[in-house]
Amino acid sequence: MIPNPCLLATPLWRYWVDSVISQYIIITIIIINLTIHLASIPVFTSLFLLANFTLWTHINALDASKAPDPPTCPSPPTYTSSPGELRYTGLAVPDQILCVLVNFFTVALHSPAKAHIIHFLVQLLAVVLPLVVERTRDNGSMLISHFVIGTAYQLKGAGVVLPLAYLLIIWRTASVRGSGTKRGTAPLTQRQAESILVSILLGFVLPSVVTAVTLNPYWIALWQPFPWWMSVTQALYLLTVPSPPSSSPSSKPGSGSALFKSTLYTLSTAAAIAHWVFLYHVFTAPSFSLPSLLTFSWLPSLSIPPRDTPHADAFAHFLEWDAVMCYATAFLGALWLLDLARTKTTSVGGWVKEVLGKIFVGVVAGPGAMLCTLWGEREDALVHAWKAEGEKNK
């Protein structure tokens, strides 16, 4: 009996169709992911340029010689009893840098924007959190170094450096809708979540609280390299606490999500309380009026301050713009990373509702609480995608 030629051709035909379809799907995924990543370049580059203008262009345009009692940090340092010119390390270069930073924060904390600055420092942790979290993941990128990036944003301003940092995170994070090796898509294990919590408590919260309570220049100087303390405490925890056996449930990706989300809830609560205290301070201030609230005159000015602006007001202006640029960068970056973590594409209408909802949360509960909500949603999305991938591979 002679086999039917059509039956012989069927496997080949099916193989060809399956191959074409699979290649089409792969190419489509690559194009979509490349489009998502390419779109981030003009967005975060624009934020970087705007931050340079509103922060450094404004500050550099001020004539410090006309300001009363300008803080000075001579090179080499001349150690005196002045808070900024104390002997912090005994080394010329670090002491000169610390002189500038301590003077800056000492003047700013005694400026009219003191409440705004404290509010910003409480919200800041949620802004820089992905620099800690995304590197910690099993398949996280080693290029995302909070130690290095944190040093840069402490010296040059978080609002200037973070747009480039978020751009790096986005480009070093793959979409779960992609194929092949996926960077930055593994949910956190229990040990990783514990290390993040330790770095937050010992590297940021403890020095921040002591600095805010004492306002001691030595503590202000010690607080400046908090990205170092966060990186070092996390590394020490991971080195000293042994990894659980691979068969242990706590070693599986996603096992640390509950602890991580509990940490986020705590951070969002602290951020919300600080935000409400700040709003109370704003609404009860003698200068507050409803027209100024509705006309957004409470936002820092885009125009360059007058050349005879006192240092206290100039530093306050700098930190206000620093906060605005940090919040805008982190908000857009969080939405981008959330989209990369989702297995399904969100519609335009869905994004509009989500953005408006998150802005409402940010206004009511504070930027830190809003960002913690987004980081929690991203972790949930990664856990869902990881479980779906595991079921598919069974």
Where in this protein do the model-derived segments appear?
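Long, hydrophobic alpha-helical transmembrane bundles and adjoining juxtamembrane helices/loops
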Residues: I2-K394
